[in-house]
């Protein structure tokens, strides 16, 4: 019998966790979580009615065929076997008797969980009728016969619930995890329901339907314990059981409450996310549904804002409502109510069109009750299903579709409304019957029933034009009809097997027939309301019946789920079999190869290619006629769509509709071009262009960066320009999706001004063709203009500006008009236009001297925006001016690098072309009036520095004293000027900017005072030899006549009797070959220095025209002999390749350029000839500037306009922008607790090692008598603030040693228990590096020691108590400390005082003043770091003597004695050192990094391209506000702490080249954006790639027996928002890099010079301290040097002028720096920027520069 039972249930596998079940589970659409008692009663009633209609099982059957039980029965439960059941078992009638309870009397027979053995356990009573476990698993089970009782009366009493033992139900599975408890409770509740205990299950309010009996409570308690072991119960369940072991009812009540709450929220979210609406249901019902869901979610704490709700609604719109997605997506503040207004409007429009069509014939009385109309929309040859539902639920979108295509699970649209205005007949499950129906499941095997289908019923569909059925047993007069073409709602073909009649026999004995199509490939049997209407049958959804026009009711309509159904019992069966239907006239296409199959076989080629290949017999075996091509045209291969995806095609001329929709200047296109590399820093690197859609008018604006505020200013400017000049308002701006356009600032600006941003789609540049093509055209013109004119590249934007002016004036071939004509502007007057780069002579209206020439050669660029003048580039003055005072030089050659002024010819054409304009200017000029001169030289000046590489077209030749120009030279020079070939430099200094030609709105009230030391931004020439250098007395014999007549053009600032001076030759870039500077007595020189000293505001501190170090010497700082060679010698500076000499023509060799002595101060250029311009002339320039500022017109971005004063510094490019405040980094725990290392450690081997370390530490504590073992104190007796918590920490050292440490919780130590004044000192890293450097130079022996348990040697003075270690088992006792336990606040200080006293008294050492933990005597130097000691000495025996003395008191271990003459490897405080005495020392961390970096979980790329530098210039951090979840934010901050912590450790140890990047990234630890994390990953990747790099020290071989200590300083001026200046210093001892520092400036600097002064002032204190340390450790003389690449800073340091600093913020710092330099005998020297290795500490550098500056000292 048992085998028969098992054979009847093949779905129950052997060994499954479920017991065998003789009854099928009831399939229902009821929510499985809805298990309240009220619904259980309905469920039982439905089951009883359904079973009463089933046939009984024959006696010979082992298992009844009826899957439903006659009445509720107690369940028979098999015993658990600590896992899956080994065999299926069922309870018999005899095993369910009361005697079976005896097993519960012996708990040993059942595998109880621990809490079952509690005193609360009790067995059931003797009268209990509940089942029990069988006595043996293998007992045969008998099956009761059907006659033994298969029907019972339905009763709700407890007694009647237990009157039968015939039910066999599936027990719940064993609970195996706390996370599975919610699902397990569902099965357990179902188990109770099947066991006739549904009445005791708590309802929603937490109360059961009836009172539970004692036996039921016992059964409930015991089964819960058996199937829910205590170790797998959730915490909240355990809490309930800890109060009352039997309170299972409370657990069930809370579980049901949780399930119902979670289910409702989940269902609402899913429904809202899958909304679908196409107008098939009333709009008001759809709105009610959506608003109800949103309200419920908001009430439950899930807030859905308007934006999200509108997006979800619009995503589900289809049909005529779909266009709302595109018309509404631009409205950011749209509400749900506004959206529904549009939906209602469309719905009402649809209803109006439907009412015009014929409706179903209905009873007039019904039309009064039912206001809805059901339109008969018949579609020939198309079956679409859209049933009318009073609950406004939307029909399935693919009900009449091929089931195989949709995996037998048609998608359900979730815009159904749960309730309707009229309540129809509703079936909650298949067993609910109404109107006397007898629901009998059809015996026909339907194909692919859908989950939500009501078996045995037809689905009413108002949208279907034909009736379709899957079963052939109801089709009469079947015949094939291959001409029928039926498609589903998705336009897919549905194969039809046959056509026939569907005959109905209704309740009034009337018979009706309609046409029906047979197909097995649909999800539902569809009954078309259209065909019923053709036979005078109408569906009345008010009464939910099918009726005739006279009101005769034919059949009821049943609502099940979201749809309406009619029972198949009204259908008359036929005698036609299914095979007959399927084989009648099979379509010819079924014998052909389907096209999708051929398409896939032939590598997914297109249909045209396949068909052509078959025609030409390139593919054999079958012909073209063998393939079914019917679906080839419409077939869409999903794999092809994915694999062959391309961008959409842009249709030519598709944008024309916008031209008709918008007026001029309402629709703009914009785009940004750039950056342009290898340009001066002050020149614009970008430009932004705008194009009007209608007129094609263009605008261009220069940009220095792409920051959002710069873009915003340009947008503000052009919008105001269009509004004021053209009286138009911009409505739409089209742009790409660059961050400069999509940022929040610009978005808010556009929204505020009512402008709609129109963005291109992702990776679709062709959609932005107007702007892209304009940029390409302008760049083509730019390159051509620069090539033709020969002008330098930094004037590239002037070429863009010129091209824009011309292009706006040229006619378009399409429109036959120019952009200016479309805009209503006059055509371009070509008489006002000059060729780009046309040579001209500009009039100097304010020369320095009356005898100086009045003309300056220049090159015309483009007409001015702000005046009637022309923008002209003056190469001699290195600036551009806006003027009308120019004369055209007509010549055959106009290229700048080819123009020959000796071959000038008069060009009649050009002169005739510009004659009218020149006459117009002449007629309007007023002679001898400077006030009316429209030239604005100061406004538009652009001063140029020297390029790092010497310009090949600029004469810069130093003149020796013997080549001084005699007095007669001046006359000769004057004669040669007319023959000089004037050429503009091809390469210019980094601070040039053609954007300077436009005025600035923001002007400084104080003019920039230029001076001889200006770095180029002030328009001055640099000097090859500083004026402050000592002057040779050998030049006193030179004549001063030439000096007076040539150089001192403005000498009114000096007394008239200053005549006794000589000339010192000075070379200046672009100056004369022979220039002299007057030399006077020492007093006179000092007096002039006061006037000539550079302004503190002077900008860039570099002078790249110099290629050698220039020391600045004073009588106090330098010895008489030249010390520059001794200071620079042996420094690891890069080797620069020699620069090739500049090739000049013969004419250039003969005479200097014009600008050598024809500069004019009013134009802003001050060369050597006017280096001594007086203060009065500068004041006059200021007045002129202020006058011109008032009349200037500003028409574009103020941030892109150059200031009146020359730029004070070069533009600094940071790697990232700094934040305003940075909090301290939270330390990261790297140790393990006791429970982690021992208690719960699953690694047995590691656990054993930690146990050994634990016992070792305990023994050491006892050995050192750490606490008082004579007495244990009660916790209540001691003051709580003197009680210190203690713990064991475990860690694994890099060498593999497992270590345990017993520590005190000093972090919660009370302040009264220690002295805050005591400090624990360790050796400073600079002191260690200094000691190592001296050891390398002096062949010292290096010995490394370790003192075990160092802190325990120090006694503790305070009265402190701790809890004993865990192994003592005295948790309620305290012990008093006697030693300084690790972790106490005072332990470090106590140990320092202890070891310091011992070293001084017993070892004869003394501590170096100012350097804690550095001890020395005449032979040995000791560096102390807690318990680690490093000994340095010339004699190894001296080290051994110290070791012997230490061992007398402390447990001292020798880590490395250092006695070998070969290479010795050390691991000193994290540094891996390789040392060979007398040769070299290498410092690195390769092994440590190889171990630590992979543990950081950073995505490393070991085989990919290695990074060549830690960062590149030009990267900025996006300053937008982060939007992160709290947990995600904390996780990322924690990750940043780990990464930056490791990088900082490596950087400050020896990788000083990374300090800038580490410092700037550390400022963003609390701003962990994706960009910051990516940059951090790149830094870690670079450290990983270069982990084998080492700091290399070779033994120095000094020429003199002295130590040389040098600091190289640098600073980068932060002149951008969110930036502060960055300072950096590198310290070198005898040519070895021993330390570095990179940090933000603590003071706000207003210029580069201020930043340089601040950097130097920060380096001097440490330099002096290191000098003292070196002198203490090594008694040799010491030379101290300070190197900087800022000549202006050097001038300030040694200047005696103090007046100029009184009003300066940093004046005090500068004057203090002077005193320190003078008092500490510092040699201040100049170093070239190219050789300044401190550059890596202040700014990100290009790869080539970074390598050049670091490869000498770290590799």
UniProtKB/Swiss-Prot annotation:
Region RNA-binding: what ranges? Answer: 299-401
Q: Which reaction does it catalyse?
A: DNA(n) + a 2'-deoxyribonucleoside 5'-triphosphate = DNA(n+1) + diphosphate; Endonucleolytic cleavage to 5'-phosphomonoester
- Keyword Transport in record: no
Family annotation (InterPro entries):
Aspartic_peptidase_AS, DNA/RNA_pol_sf, Integrase_cat-core, Retrotran_Ty1/copia-like, RNaseH-like_sf, RNaseH_sf, RVT_2, TYA
Q: Where is the Reverse transcriptase Ty1/copia-type domain?
A: 1338-1476
Encoding gene per record: TY1B-LR1
Domain description? The C-terminal RNA-binding region of CA is sufficient for all its nucleocapsid-like chaperone activities.
The segment(s) forming the Integrase catalytic domain are: 660-835
Region (Disordered) location: 1-93, 126-173, 352-421, 956-1170
- What is the active site of this protein? 461
Q: Which domain of life is it from?
A: Eukaryota
Which positions fall inside the RNase H Ty1/copia-type domain? 1610-1752
**Predominant place of localization:** cytoplasm
Q: Which GO terms describe its molecular function?
A: aspartic-type endopeptidase activity; ATP binding; DNA binding; DNA-directed DNA polymerase activity; RNA binding; RNA-directed DNA polymerase activity; RNA-DNA hybrid ribonuclease activity; zinc ion binding
Q: Which residues form a coiled coil?
A: none
The biological processes this protein is annotated with in GO are:
DNA integration; DNA recombination; proteolysis; transposition; viral translational frameshifting
Q: Which organism is it from?
A: Saccharomyces cerevisiae (strain ATCC 204508 / S288c)
- Whom does it interact with, and what assembly results? The capsid protein forms a homotrimer, from which the VLPs are assembled. The protease is a homodimer, whose active site consists of two apposed aspartic acid residues.
Feature: compositional bias, Basic and acidic residues: 1038-1053
Q: By what name is this protein known?
A: Transposon Ty1-LR1 Gag-Pol polyprotein
């Amino acid at each position: 019998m048992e085998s028969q039972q098992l054979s009847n249930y093949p779905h129950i596998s052997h060994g499954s966790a479920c017991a065998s079940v003789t009854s099928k589970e009831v399939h229902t659409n009821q929510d499985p979580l809805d298990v309240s008692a009220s619904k259980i009663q309905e469920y039982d009633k439905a089951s009883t009615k359904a079973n009463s209609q089933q046939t009984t099982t024959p006696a010979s059957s082992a298992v009844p065929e009826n899957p439903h039980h006659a009445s509720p029965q107690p369940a028979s439960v098999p015993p658990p076997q600590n896992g899956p059941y080994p065999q299926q078992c069922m309870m018999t009638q005899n095993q369910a008797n009361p005697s079976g309870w005896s097993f519960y009397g012996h708990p040993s027979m059942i595998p109880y969980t621990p809490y079952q053995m509690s005193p609360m356990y009790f067995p059931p009573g003797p009268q209990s009728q509940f089942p029990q476990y069988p006595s043996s698993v293998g007992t045969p089970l008998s099956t009761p016969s059907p006659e033994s009782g298969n029907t019972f009366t339905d009763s709700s009493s407890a007694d009647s619930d237990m009157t039968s033992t015939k039910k066999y139900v599936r027990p719940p599975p064993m609970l195996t995890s706390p996370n599975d408890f919610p699902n397990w409770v569902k099965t357990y509740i179902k188990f109770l329901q099947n066991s006739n205990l549904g009445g005791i299950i708590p309802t929603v309010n937490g109360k059961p339907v009836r009172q539970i009996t004692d036996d039921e409570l016992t059964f409930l308690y015991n089964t819960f314990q058996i199937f829910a072991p205590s170790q797998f119960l959730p915490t909240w369940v355990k809490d309930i059981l800890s109060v009352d072991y039997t309170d299972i009812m409370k657990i069930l009540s809370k579980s049901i409450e949780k399930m119902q709450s979670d289910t409702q929220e989940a269902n609402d979210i899913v429904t809202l996310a899958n909304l679908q609406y196409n107008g098939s249901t009333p709009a008001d019902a759809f709105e009610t549904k959506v608003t109800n869901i949103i309200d419920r979610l908001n009430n439950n704490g899930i807030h859905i804002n308007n934006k999200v709700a509108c997006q979800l609604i619009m995503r589900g719109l289809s049909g005529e409502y779909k266009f709302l997605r595109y018309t509404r997506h631009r409205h950011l503040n749209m509400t749900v109510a506004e959206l529904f207004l549009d939906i209602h409007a469309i719905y009402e429009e649809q209803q109006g069109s439907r009412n015009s069509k014929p409706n179903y014939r209905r009873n007039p009385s019904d039309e009064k009750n039912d206001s809805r109309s059901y339109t008969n929309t018949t579609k020939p040859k198309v079956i679409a299903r859209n049933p009318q539902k009073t609950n406004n639920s939307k029909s399935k979108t693919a009900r009449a579709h091929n089931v195989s295509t949709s995996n037998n699970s048609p998608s359900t649209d979730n815009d159904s409304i749960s309730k309707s205005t009229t309540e129809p007949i509703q079936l909650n499950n298949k067993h609910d019957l109404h109107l006397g129906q007898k629901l009998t499941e059809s015996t026909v095997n339907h194909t692919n029933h859908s989950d939500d289908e009501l078996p045995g019923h037809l689905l009413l569909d108002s949208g279907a034009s034909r009736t379709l059925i899957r079963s052939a047993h109801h089709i009469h007069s079947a015949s094939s009809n291959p001409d029928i073409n039926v498609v589903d709602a998705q336009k897919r073909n549905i194969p039809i097997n046959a056509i026939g009649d569907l005959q109905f026999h209704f309740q009034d004995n009337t018979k009706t027939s309609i046409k029906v199509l047979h197909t097995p490939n649909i999800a539902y049997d569809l009954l078309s309301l259209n065909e019923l209407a053709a036979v005078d049958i109408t569906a009345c959804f008010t009464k939910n019946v099918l009726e005739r026009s006279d009101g005769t009711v034919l059949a009821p309509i049943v609502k099940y789920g979201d749809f309406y159904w009619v029972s198949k019992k009204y259908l008359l069966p036929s005698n036609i079999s299914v095979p007959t239907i399927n084989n009648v006239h099979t379509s010819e296409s079924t014998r052909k190869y389907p096209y999708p199959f051929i398409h896939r076989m032939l590598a997914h080629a297109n249909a045209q290619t396949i068909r052509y290949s078959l025609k030409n017999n390139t593919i054999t075996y079958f012909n073209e006629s063998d393939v079914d091509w019917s679906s080839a045209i419409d077939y869409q291969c999903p794999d092809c769509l994915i694999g062959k995806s391309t961008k959409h095609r842009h249709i030519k001329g598709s944008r024309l509709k916008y031209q008709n929709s918008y007026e001029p200047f309402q629709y703009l296109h914009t785009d940004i071009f750039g950056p342009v590399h290898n340009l001066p820093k002050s020149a614009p690197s970008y430009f932004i262009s705008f194009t009007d859609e209608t007129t094609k008018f263009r605008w261009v604006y220069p940009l220095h960066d792409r920051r959002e505020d710069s873009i915003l200013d340009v947008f503000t400017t052009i919008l105001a320009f269009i509004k004021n000049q053209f009286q138009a308002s911009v409505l739409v701006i089209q742009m790409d999706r660059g961050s400069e356009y999509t940022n929040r600032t610009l978005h808010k600006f556009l929204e505020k001004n009512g402008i709609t941003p129109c963005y291109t789609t992702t990776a679709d540049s062709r959609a932005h063709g107007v702007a892209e093509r304009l940029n390409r055209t302008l760049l083509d013109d730019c390159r051509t203009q620069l090539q033709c004119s020969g002008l330098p590249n930094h004037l590239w934007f002037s070429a863009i500006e010129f091209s824009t002016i011309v292009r706006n004036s040229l006619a378009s071939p399409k429109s036959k008009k120019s952009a200016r004509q479309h805009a209503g502007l006059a055509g371009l007057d070509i008489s006002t236009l000059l060729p780009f780069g046309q040579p001209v002579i500009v009039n100097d209206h304010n020369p320095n001297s009356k005898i100086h020439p009045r003309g300056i050669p220049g090159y015309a660029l483009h007409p001015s925006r702000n005046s009637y003048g022309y923008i002209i580039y003056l190469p001699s003055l290195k600036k551009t001016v806006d003027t009308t005072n120019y004369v055209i030089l007509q010549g055959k050659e106009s290229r700048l690098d080819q123009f020959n002024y000796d071959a000038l010819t008069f060009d009649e054409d050009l002169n005739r072309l510009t004659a009218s304009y020149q006459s117009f200017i002449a007629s309007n000029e007023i002679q001898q009036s400077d006030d009316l001169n429209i030239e604005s030289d100061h406004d538009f000046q652009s001063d140029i520095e020297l390029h790092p590489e010497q310009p090949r077209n600029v004469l810069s030749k130093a003149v020796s004293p013997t080549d001084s120009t005699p007095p007669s030279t001046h006359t000769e020079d004057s004669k040669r000027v007319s023959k000089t070939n004037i050429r503009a430099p091809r390469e210019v200094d980094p601070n040039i900017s053609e954007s300077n030609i436009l005025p600035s709105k923001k002007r400084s009230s104080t003019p920039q005072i230029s001076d001889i030391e200006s770095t180029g931004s002030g328009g001055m020439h640099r000097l090859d030899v500083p004026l402050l250098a000592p002057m040779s007395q050998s030049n006193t014999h030179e004549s001063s006549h030439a000096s007076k007549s040539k150089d001192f053009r403005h000498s009114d600032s000096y007394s008239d009797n200053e005549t006794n001076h000589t000339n010192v030759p000075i070379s200046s870039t672009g100056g004369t070959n022979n220039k002299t500077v007057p030399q006077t007595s020492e007093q006179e020189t000092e007096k002039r220095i006061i006037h000539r000293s550079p302004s503190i505001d002077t900008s860039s501190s570099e002078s790249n025209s110099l290629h050698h170090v220039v020391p600045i010497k004073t009588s106090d700082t330098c010895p008489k002999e030249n010390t520059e060679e001794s200071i620079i010698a042996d420094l690891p500076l890069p080797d620069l390749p020699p620069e090739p000499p500049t090739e000049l023509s013969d004419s250039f060799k003969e005479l200097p350029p014009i600008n050598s002595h024809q500069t004019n101060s009013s134009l802003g250029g001050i060369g050597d000839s006017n280096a001594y311009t007086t203060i009065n002339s500068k004041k006059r320039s200021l007045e002129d500037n202020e006058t011109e500022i008032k009349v200037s017109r500003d028409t574009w971005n103020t941030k892109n306009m150059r200031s009146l004063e020359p730029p004070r510094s070069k533009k600094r490019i940071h790697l990232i922008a700094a934040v305003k405040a940075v909090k301290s980094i939270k330390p990261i725990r790297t140790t393990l607790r006791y429970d982690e290392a021992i208690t719960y450690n699953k690694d047995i081997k590691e656990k054993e090692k930690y146990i050994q370390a634990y016992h070792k530490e305990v023994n050491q504590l006892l050995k050192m008598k750490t606490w008082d073992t004579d007495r244990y104190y009660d916790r209540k007796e001691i003051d709580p603030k003197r009680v210190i918590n203690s713990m064991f920490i475990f860690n694994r050292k890099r060498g593999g040693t497992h270590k345990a440490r017993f520590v005190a919780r000093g972090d919660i130590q009370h302040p009264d228990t220690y002295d805050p004044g005591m400090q624990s000192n360790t050796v400073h890293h600079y002191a260690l590096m200094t000691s190592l450097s001296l050891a390398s130079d002096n062949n010292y022996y290096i010995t490394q020691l370790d003192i075990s348990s160092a802190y325990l040697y120090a006694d503790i003075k305070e009265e402190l108590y701790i809890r004993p270690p865990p192994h003592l088992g005295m948790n309620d006792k305290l012990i008093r400390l006697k030693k300084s336990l690790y972790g106490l606040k005072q332990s470090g200080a106590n140990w320092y005082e202890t070891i310091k006293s011992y070293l001084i008294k017993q070892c004869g050492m003394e501590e170096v003043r100012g350097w804690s933990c550095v001890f020395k005597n005449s032979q040995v130097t000791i560096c102390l770091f807690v318990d680690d000691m490093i000994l340095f000495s010339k004699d190894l025996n001296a080290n051994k003597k110290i070791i012997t003395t230490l061992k007398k008191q402390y447990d001292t271990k020798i880590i490395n004695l250092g006695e070998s003459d070969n290479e010795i490897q050390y691991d000193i405080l994290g540094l891996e050192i390789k040392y060979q005495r007398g040769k070299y020392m290498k410092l690195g961390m390769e092994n440590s990094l190889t171990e630590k970096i992979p543990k950081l979980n950073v995505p490393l790329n070991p085989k990919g391209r290695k990074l060549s530098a830690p960062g590149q210039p030009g990267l900025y951090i996006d300053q937008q506000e982060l939007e992160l979840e709290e947990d995600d934010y904390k996780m990322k901050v924690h990750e940043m702490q780990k990464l930056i912590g490791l990088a900082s450790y490596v950087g400050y140890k020896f990788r000083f080249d990374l300090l800038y990047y580490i410092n700037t990234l550390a400022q963003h630890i609390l701003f962990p954006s994706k960009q910051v994390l990516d940059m951090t990953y790149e830094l870690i990747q670079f450290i990983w790639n270069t982990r084998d790099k080492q700091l290399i020290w070779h033994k120095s071989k000094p020429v003199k027996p002295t130590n040389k200590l040098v600091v190289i300083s640098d600073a980068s001026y932060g002149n951008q928002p969110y930036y502060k200046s960055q300072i950096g210093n590198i310290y070198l001892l005898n040519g070895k890099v021993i330390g570095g520092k990179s940090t933000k400036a603590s003071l706000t600097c207003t210029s580069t010079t201020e930043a340089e002064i601040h950097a130097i002032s920060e380096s001097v204190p440490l330099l002096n301290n290191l000098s003292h340390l070196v002198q203490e450790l090594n008694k040799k003389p010491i030379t101290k040097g300070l190197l900087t690449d800022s000549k202006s800073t050097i001038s300030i340091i040694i200047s005696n002028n103090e007046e100029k600093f009184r009003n300066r913020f940093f004046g005090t710092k500068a004057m203090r720096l002077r005193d320190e330099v003078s008092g500490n005998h510092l040699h201040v020297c100049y170093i070239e920027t190219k050789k300044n290795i401190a550059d890596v500490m202040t700014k990100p550098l290009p790869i080539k520069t970074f390598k050049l500056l670091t490869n000498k000292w770290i590799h």
